[in-house]
Amino acid sequence: QNWLEQHGAVRIGYLKNDVGISLVDTESEKPVGIINDYISLVSGYLGELAIEFQLTGFESQEKELQALKDNRIDMIFHMNQNPYEAEQNDIILSNTVFEINVAVLTGVKKFDENKENTVAVSRNNLLGKWYISFNYPFWKIKEYDSSAEADKAVQSGEADCFVVKAGQSLKTLEDSKMRSIFLTKSGASCFAVTRENTTLMNILNKTIQTLPDSRLSSQFCVYENAPG
């Protein structure tokens, strides 16, 4: 509590184009998604002392990480569980806050997630790379300049698959010859803070304990499948 009193509002960094989590609405310019559910569920959890949050949107995960290192934000909402990458980036990760079902789009007739596959990833998709290297370390990551290029690589057979949130896989499939296959490992999403900021991490882990079980994961599906 002392930390919050001295520090004031907790500055959250989020991704502006993160469907279901923090997709910025073009009219209100505010994020829509489970970031709002988290804030409303936990802001009063410490009793008399309400936790205040201040939101800043970013175009990419790299920019979020840089802002965290520069002390322009206190935490990132959200990263994927990956202890090795966290250590490389001098950050610590919270307990899992919510989980997302993940699918691959592939042209391979008999796709097997337990074999070594070549996965196309757009260069700036840090979350995707963290998810793959943690859950499927034996897959070979091939980077492309954009998700459109990654898509093309799979269509042409240059790569076996690319990874998407399960809900979006169906939208992408409408205009493609590929098929969507759900992976058995979900994406475990967590908060990130700098390594020194253990007090805030303790506070965040306590807020996660107060969340109704899998509430945010199920809310995520509602947002992701909303028409639009």
How would you name each of these model-derived features?
Residues 80, 103-172:
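Pocket-lining segment of extracytoplasmic ligand-binding domains
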Residues 11, 103-105, 190-192:
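Residues embedded in well-ordered beta-strands
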